Amino acid sequence: MARVKRAVNAQKKRRTVLEQASGYRGQRSRLYRKAKEQVTHSLVYAYRDRKARKGDFRRLWIQRINAAARAEGMTYNRFIQGLKAAEIEVDRRMLAELAVSDPAAFGALVRTAKAALPVAPVAAEGTAA
Protein backbone atom coordinates (compact mmCIF):
# COMPACT_ATOMS: atom_id res chain seq x y z
CA MET A 1 0.00 0.00 0.00
CA ALA A 2 1.28 3.48 -0.87
CA ARG A 3 2.38 5.84 1.85
CA VAL A 4 0.07 8.82 2.46
CA LYS A 5 1.86 12.13 2.81
CA ARG A 6 -0.21 14.94 4.30
CA ALA A 7 2.39 17.54 5.22
CA VAL A 8 1.36 19.93 2.44
CA ASN A 9 -2.29 19.83 3.45
CA ALA A 10 -1.49 20.29 7.14
CA GLN A 11 0.79 23.24 6.44
CA LYS A 12 -1.83 24.84 4.19
CA LYS A 13 -4.50 24.41 6.86
CA ARG A 14 -2.28 25.96 9.52
CA ARG A 15 -1.20 28.81 7.25
CA THR A 16 -4.85 29.58 6.42
CA VAL A 17 -5.83 29.75 10.10
CA LEU A 18 -2.83 31.92 10.98
CA GLU A 19 -3.65 34.28 8.09
CA GLN A 20 -7.21 34.58 9.36
CA ALA A 21 -5.83 35.35 12.83
CA SER A 22 -3.44 38.06 11.66
CA GLY A 23 -4.17 41.24 13.56
CA TYR A 24 -5.12 39.43 16.76
CA ARG A 25 -3.08 40.22 19.86
CA GLY A 26 -0.42 38.02 21.41
CA GLN A 27 -0.38 34.26 21.02
CA ARG A 28 -3.71 34.30 19.22
CA SER A 29 -1.99 35.49 16.08
CA ARG A 30 1.16 33.34 16.39
CA LEU A 31 0.35 29.94 17.88
CA TYR A 32 -1.78 27.62 15.77
CA ARG A 33 -3.91 26.14 18.55
CA LYS A 34 -4.73 29.50 20.12
CA ALA A 35 -5.31 31.04 16.70
CA LYS A 36 -7.66 28.22 15.71
CA GLU A 37 -9.74 28.68 18.87
CA GLN A 38 -9.93 32.43 18.38
CA VAL A 39 -10.77 32.23 14.66
CA THR A 40 -13.57 29.75 15.41
CA HIS A 41 -14.92 32.01 18.13
CA SER A 42 -14.61 35.04 15.86
CA LEU A 43 -16.63 33.33 13.16
CA VAL A 44 -19.33 32.52 15.71
CA TYR A 45 -19.40 36.16 16.80
CA ALA A 46 -19.60 37.30 13.18
CA TYR A 47 -22.51 34.97 12.42
CA ARG A 48 -24.39 35.97 15.57
CA ASP A 49 -23.86 39.68 15.05
CA ARG A 50 -24.93 39.58 11.41
CA LYS A 51 -28.28 38.37 12.71
CA ALA A 52 -28.35 40.87 15.59
CA ARG A 53 -27.56 43.81 13.29
CA LYS A 54 -31.02 43.59 11.74
CA GLY A 55 -32.70 44.09 15.11
CA ASP A 56 -30.27 46.86 16.03
CA PHE A 57 -31.18 48.82 12.91
CA ARG A 58 -34.90 48.28 13.46
CA ARG A 59 -34.56 49.66 17.02
CA LEU A 60 -32.63 52.66 15.68
CA TRP A 61 -35.30 53.36 13.06
CA ILE A 62 -38.05 53.16 15.68
CA GLN A 63 -36.20 55.61 17.95
CA ARG A 64 -35.80 58.07 15.09
CA ILE A 65 -39.45 57.76 14.05
CA ASN A 66 -40.59 58.17 17.67
CA ALA A 67 -38.48 61.32 18.14
CA ALA A 68 -39.78 62.87 14.92
CA ALA A 69 -43.39 61.88 15.67
CA ARG A 70 -43.18 63.36 19.17
CA ALA A 71 -41.86 66.60 17.65
CA GLU A 72 -45.12 66.64 15.66
CA GLY A 73 -47.17 65.98 18.82
CA MET A 74 -47.80 62.26 18.39
CA THR A 75 -46.35 59.08 19.84
CA TYR A 76 -44.76 56.33 17.76
CA ASN A 77 -47.48 53.86 18.67
CA ARG A 78 -50.34 56.16 17.62
CA PHE A 79 -48.44 57.17 14.49
CA ILE A 80 -48.04 53.56 13.30
CA GLN A 81 -51.66 52.85 14.23
CA GLY A 82 -52.76 55.88 12.19
CA LEU A 83 -50.68 54.83 9.19
CA LYS A 84 -52.29 51.38 9.26
CA ALA A 85 -55.76 52.96 9.53
CA ALA A 86 -54.95 55.22 6.56
CA GLU A 87 -53.71 52.14 4.67
CA ILE A 88 -50.28 53.68 4.12
CA GLU A 89 -47.66 50.97 3.79
CA VAL A 90 -44.23 52.50 4.35
CA ASP A 91 -41.61 50.46 6.17
CA ARG A 92 -39.78 51.75 9.23
CA ARG A 93 -36.54 52.18 7.33
CA MET A 94 -38.15 54.62 4.89
CA LEU A 95 -40.05 56.41 7.68
CA ALA A 96 -36.78 56.94 9.58
CA GLU A 97 -35.08 58.20 6.41
CA LEU A 98 -37.97 60.62 5.80
CA ALA A 99 -37.86 61.81 9.41
CA VAL A 100 -34.15 62.65 9.10
CA SER A 101 -33.89 63.94 5.53
CA ASP A 102 -37.34 65.41 4.77
CA PRO A 103 -39.18 66.57 7.91
CA ALA A 104 -41.89 68.30 5.85
CA ALA A 105 -42.90 65.06 4.14
CA PHE A 106 -42.78 63.25 7.49
CA GLY A 107 -45.03 65.96 8.96
CA ALA A 108 -47.51 65.36 6.14
CA LEU A 109 -47.53 61.65 7.00
CA VAL A 110 -48.13 62.49 10.67
CA ARG A 111 -51.08 64.71 9.74
CA THR A 112 -52.51 61.94 7.54
CA ALA A 113 -52.09 59.43 10.37
CA LYS A 114 -53.78 61.80 12.84
CA ALA A 115 -56.73 62.25 10.50
CA ALA A 116 -57.14 58.49 10.05
CA LEU A 117 -57.21 57.73 13.77
CA PRO A 118 -60.64 57.31 15.35
CA VAL A 119 -61.44 59.89 18.02
CA ALA A 120 -61.53 58.26 21.44
CA PRO A 121 -64.78 58.90 23.33
CA VAL A 122 -64.39 61.07 26.43
CA ALA A 123 -65.34 59.31 29.68
CA ALA A 124 -68.08 60.95 31.74
CA GLU A 125 -66.99 62.71 34.90
CA GLY A 126 -66.86 60.60 38.03
CA THR A 127 -66.65 57.29 36.20
CA ALA A 128 -63.60 55.14 35.89
CA ALA A 129 -62.41 54.75 32.34
Swiss-Prot record:
One of its GO terms (molecular function) is structural constituent of ribosome. Keywords: Ribonucleoprotein, Ribosomal protein, RNA-binding, rRNA-binding. PROSITE patterns: RIBOSOMAL_L20. SUPFAM superfamilies: Ribosomal protein L20. One of its GO terms (biological process) is translation. InterPro entries: Ribosomal_bL20, RIBOSOMAL_L20_CS, Ribosomal_protein_bL20_C. GO terms for cellular component: ribonucleoprotein complex; ribosome. It holds the Pfam family Ribosomal_L20. Gene3D superfamilies: 6.10.160.10, Ribosomal protein L20. Signal peptide: none annotated. The keyword Hydrolase does not apply. HAMAP family: Ribosomal_bL20. PANTHER family: 39S RIBOSOMAL PROTEIN L20. Binds directly to 23S ribosomal RNA and is necessary for the in vitro assembly process of the 50S ribosomal subunit. It is not involved in the protein synthesizing functions of that subunit. Belongs to the bacterial ribosomal protein bL20 family. This is Large ribosomal subunit protein bL20. It comes from Kineococcus radiotolerans (strain ATCC BAA-149 / DSM 14245 / SRS30216).
